[in-house]
Amino acid sequence: MALVKSKPTSPGRRFVVKTKDARLHQGGPYEPLVVQKSKTGGRNSNGRITTRHRGGGHKQRYRQIDFKRNKTGVPGKVERLEYDPNRSANIALVLYQDGERRYIIAPRGVEPGSPIQSGRDAAIKPGNALPLRNIPVGTQVHCVELKPGKGAQLARSAGAGVQVVARESGMATLRLRSGEMRRVPADCMATVGEVGNAEHSLRNLGKAGAKRHLGVRPTVRGVAMNPVDHPHGGGEGRTAGGRHPVSPWGMPTKGHKTRKNKRTDKYIVRRRKR
């Protein structure tokens, strides 16, 4: 993995920093694991915007990722590493001994040809998936389930990792990158190691058009709008908004707690840092 800086041949190229990985497969994806993906533009079935700042972008196809890692007892080998337009992490195509191929999130340190295995008896090596009860305390893991068999939900983005800090009475305590300490069932599957492509956070797109290629539309400040569009809008000349920062719907923002899932509060040992 290397960072490539562009020469300032134009204003749009001056600050561009991209990542380059010679290990990535240069061809197309493995077709049996690819499905069509239609864009929503941030709209729901009623045509109303439910997620702002989405629209346009390059056409993408979805790669079906094995987040459950339920191929237990069958050894596999990483066939190749690939770019995935749907996520910040790279993905690895694994060929198992029975002939089946599956995509997984590519961990750091896994190369083409690396052995991969899932199950209680798998070795504690990057890329292998085990139940949390079989992973030693202090180990860094990623792609962690919150419910056994549901599939990985935690630590799936580039460079992400979670540390197993304790295990007792059928529950494992994890320390997340945000500083949150959370308890999950010890039967949940997790993959050893950290997610690769950690340099993703160091890239600089350099121009607005590159962001539009990703399907991201501009973010307009509330104070630049009219009063009908935002609580901060309106006023003669430039104003500071006249109130504490709020969303377009009047909800406090910038530090206001919005978590509402009280049902799972009992699993959070320590809240994340703010």
Curated annotation (Swiss-Prot):
Residues 50-61, 254-274 have a biased composition (Basic residues). Keywords: Ribonucleoprotein, Ribosomal protein, RNA-binding, rRNA-binding. SMART domains: Ribosomal_L2, Ribosomal_L2_C. One of its GO terms (molecular function) is transferase activity. Residues 37-46 have a biased composition (Polar residues). Part of the 50S ribosomal subunit. Forms a bridge to the 30S subunit in the 70S ribosome. This is Large ribosomal subunit protein uL2.
